[in-house]
């Protein structure tokens, strides 16, 4: 099956040129996006809902269209194919360069498909990114909605979760009262818009609760909050050791709760160009030891100075 997706030398040359073009801050042509999305779907449709991932690798949280900070992330973490990456979703919306960001992510996936895993986040969904910036950005940069439609079609093929060395469960949001076993994720039809409720929704929308046990109503209007007791039960039942997720702005770029068994990773520094937060990536070595690296925003011209402050609750 993998051989069907092997790139020819001509295709490798083309994708390398596209990666170089994107790194220079140029957008792809409409035809280049179309070809990229076709190839990406061929690769992604062969991936299961739960990706089994080997260490060593680097886990990254939300990017949200902050393209310069994504380039900085690769500078810090290492470029592909020298470093293996697992991204936890939310590549688009809010930031001003979602087009460049997701174009680069997909190009890297096509070029180094076994070295990078791209999970789906709650913003990889038409209903959300039509409101929070991605649709408008695509229209502004291409003059129509064709590219947006092509990208959003790819979103449905992104896997929903990953497990690192059969011990670390990874998803964008978190747990679900509808899930006792991770095997239930395998049964989901992921090639669709994110439902408003149920297991698929919760994987991408839920948040851990620091101070309360049990399940709670999420202030986001989708997903749930879950307590330390839920984490302990889930990990024990599935013979896992930790949960790694993204989805929430945390001011230090990383936060560990539930006896350090639930880890939130956020990789967009100075989120929305105004929150003043640090970002973080987490390297996991062969012994599953985690090494966190925090970083500040990449330098930009004409960007206002921001002071660190506790942010509003973001969707």
UniProtKB/Swiss-Prot annotation:
| Database matches in InterPro entries | Calcineurin-like_PHP_ApaH, Metallo-depent_PP-like, PPA2-like, Ser/Thr-sp_prot-phosphatase
Q: Which cofactor does it need?
A: Mn(2+)
What post-translational events are described? Reversibly methyl esterified on Leu-315 by leucine carboxyl methyltransferase 1 (PPM1) and protein phosphatase methylesterase 1 (PPE1). Carboxyl methylation influences the affinity of the catalytic subunit for the different regulatory subunits, thereby modulating the PP2A holoenzyme's substrate specificity, enzyme activity and cellular localization.
Q: Cofactor note, please?
A: Binds 2 manganese ions per subunit.
Specify where the region named Disordered lies, as residue ranges.
294-315
| Nucleotidyltransferase recorded as keyword | no
Q: Where are the transmembrane segments?
A: none
CDD domains under this entry?
Answer: MPP_PP2A_PP4_PP6
Molecular function (GO) terms for this protein are: metal ion binding; protein serine/threonine phosphatase activity
Give the E.C. number(s).
3.1.3.16
Biological process terms from the Gene Ontology for this record are: mitotic cell cycle
Name the SMART domains on file: PP2Ac
Q: State any GO CC term.
A: cytosol
- Start-end of Basic and acidic residues biased regions: 298-315
Active site per database record:
123
Record keywords = Hydrolase, Manganese, Metal-binding, Methylation, Protein phosphatase
PROSITE patterns associated with the record: SER_THR_PHOSPHATASE
Pfam families under this entry?
Metallophos
Q: What general EC class does the enzyme of this chain belong to?
A: hydrolase
Q: Belongs to which family? A: Belongs to the PPP phosphatase family. PP-2A subfamily.
Name-wise, this protein is: Serine/threonine-protein phosphatase PP2A catalytic subunit 2
Q: Which organism is it from?
A: Paramecium tetraurelia
Its organism's taxonomic lineage begins at:
Eukaryota, Sar, Alveolata, Ciliophora, Intramacronucleata
